[in-house]
């Protein structure tokens, strides 16, 4: 029962911050990926997006775990990750989900952030403007396509730059195609 319920859940994760060095490092291919910015109020209202609970206590599943217990487990994370300021959408397998696990008719992002090391990647690929995943050695997104899609959907695009005197990122707007 519990395993069937767990396997029927889809989880999407979001953060309140877009300028965290650790998160760009481990979630965005060491600053070479992208970050999509959404309106949190819209996610809460439309999808019941909920804040992650950070705790030093582990919640265990039991065979007879209730949906409430499973949801609490799904929304709980070690307090060592509190810097992520994470929110999650938890959806039970339903008509809003496509077969690939993608939410149908999901809201558009408000902005797109291109990793600050993306220019290095473009240069490494002989100016073939593809976002590149070195670990898997595969191209997974065409930068020009992303920029064109953003322009067509009136989405702002930024490339954070690292300041010279501090460990901080500042957003720099990119001109679209």
Located regions from the model:
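Catalytic-core loop-and-flanking beta/alpha module that positions acidic residues
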Residues: 1-177
